[in-house]
């Protein structure tokens, strides 16, 4: 498990399978064979936490439907696991349409250690509509009070609109054999519901060529499964999906007056909608290529999230890290011996930001048995203080009993900012 991971991780990212939490999937949630892969991943993280090597930041990505999947039980299970391991947690729902002509809403759950100072500009006091939609707010309100107490609303700046439309990513010069026949296109139109036919008629009468998308959606009926051709004509592509899901391959719809033509989206067009560079080497087969797109996260979304939130948080977690990598290597041996050890003068840091104080601060590392570490962290969470402050208060009481003054804090280690 975690023994094969060296040192302390600044950031851990997991995009666990969405098949069982997606609208297009089986909806069995984190109990499902695919999406349940979260739990083996989490077992590794828990081992790192117990070894004193908790990752500074944890980022989890999945489809937006995770918020309500499995009767609404999956989201609190994930958030509760993070909080139980000593993290504060927040989440954002980001649509790739903010960056690309591609509607792709994904939830990003971001957690950071309880003791880490968070820059004020990375937080907002109240949820914002752009990234904290109503279903997320309701799910947070329904969390147990002890878990909700550790919730954060992350601040993410909105990007500048790119202005790119679906027509801008369409490949020209598609050979005649790449288009559907008139009969195939007529069959798709016949599977549109009245609302989609209205959209099609609007494109026909717009007076200019229009490009839209169709995706085939299957529904279970009493008398069998029915298929519908869902249309989008607003210059943004519908979400690219796995080609073997209940919602099938993406189809492009071209309308110019009474002329209506359809064809499958090309791999190059799909890559552009995911924000991949033209030089990106794609698989050789259609299904393998769109399998990548269906499983993937839009590139500019991750880049924006990393630059504006994840990297600043990782820097903060790294600066707070209480031990050196060399000291971490001793943790496993201490756990085997069953000892509690205090190693002084592991690191020293010059005092720069406290007027009137000169010299250096001395860092110490406390090694605890896993069960004791867990017990103390839970107590710290209940008291709404950092683990450091919890231990320091115990030291203050012993000093007071011996007629000595409490320990002077070089930096605030009480309730962490943003907690």
Model-derived regions: residue spans:
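Class I S-adenosyl-L-methionine
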Residues: 2-11, 19, 23-232
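Short, conserved micro-motifs enriched in small and acidic residues
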Residues: 31, 35, 292-300, 385, ...
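C-terminal target-recognition/interaction regions appended to catalytic cores
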Residues: 173-323
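Short acidic/His/Gly/Ser-rich catalytic and metal-binding motifs that mark active-site loops
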Residues: 18-24, 249, 282
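A detector of short terminal or domain-flanking linear segments
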Residues: 319-360, 371, 419
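Short amphipathic alpha-helical segments
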Residues: 364-368, 376, 384-396
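Short, positively charged interaction helices/loops
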Residues: 400-419
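The alpha-helix within a helix-turn-helix
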Residues: 380
């Amino acid at each position: 498990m975690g023994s094969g991971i060296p040192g302390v991780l600044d950031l851990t990212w997991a995009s666990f399978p969405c098949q069982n939490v997606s609208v297009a999937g089986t909806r069995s949630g984190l109990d499902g064979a695919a999406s349940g892969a979260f739990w083996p991943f989490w077992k590794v993280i828990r081992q790192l936490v117990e070894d004193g090597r908790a990752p500074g930041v944890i980022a989890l990505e999945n489809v937006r439907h995770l918020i309500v999947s499995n009767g609404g039980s999956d989201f609190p299970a994930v958030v509760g696991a993070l909080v139980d391991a000593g993290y504060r947690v927040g989440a954002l729902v980001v649509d790739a349409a903010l960056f690309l002509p591609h509607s792709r809403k994904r939830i990003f759950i971001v957690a950071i250690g309880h003791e880490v100072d968070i820059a004020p500009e990375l937080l907002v006091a109240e949820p914002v509509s752009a990234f904290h939609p109503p279903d997320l707010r309701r799910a947070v309100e329904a969390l147990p009070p002890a878990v909700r107490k550790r919730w954060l609303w992350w601040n993410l700046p909105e990007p500048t609109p790119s202005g790119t439309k679906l027509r801008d990513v369409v490949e020209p010069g598609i050979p005649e054999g790449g288009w559907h026949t008139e009969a195939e296109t007529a069959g798709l139109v016949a599977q549109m519901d009245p609302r989609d036919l209205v959209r099609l008629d609007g494109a026909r009468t717009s007076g200019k060529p229009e490009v839209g998308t169709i995706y085939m959606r299957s529904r279970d009926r009493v008398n069998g499964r029915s298929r519908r051709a869902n249309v989008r004509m607003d210059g943004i592509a519908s979400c690219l999906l796995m080609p073997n899901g209940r919602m099938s391959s993406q189809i492009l719809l071209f309308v110019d007056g009474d002329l209506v033509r359809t064809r499958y989206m090309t791999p190059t067009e799909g890559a552009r909608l995911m924000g991949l560079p033209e030089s990106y080497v794609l698989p050789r087969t259609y299904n393998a290529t769109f399998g990548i797109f269906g499983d993937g996260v839009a590139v500019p979304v991750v880049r924006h999230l990393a630059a504006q939130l994840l990297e600043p948080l990782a820097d903060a977690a790294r600066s707070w890290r209480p031990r050196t990598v060399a000291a971490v290597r001793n943790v496993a041996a201490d756990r085997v011996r069953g000892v509690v050890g205090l190693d002084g003068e592991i690191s020293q840091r010059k005092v720069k930001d406290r007027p009137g104080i000169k010299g250096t601060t001395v860092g110490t590392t406390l090694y605890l048995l896993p069960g004791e570490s867990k017990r103390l962290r839970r107590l710290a969470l209940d008291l709404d203080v950092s683990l450091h402050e919890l231990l320091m208060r115990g030291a203050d009481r012993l000093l007071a009993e011996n007629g000595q003054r409490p320990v002077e804090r070089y930096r605030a280690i009480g309730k962490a900012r943003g907690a």
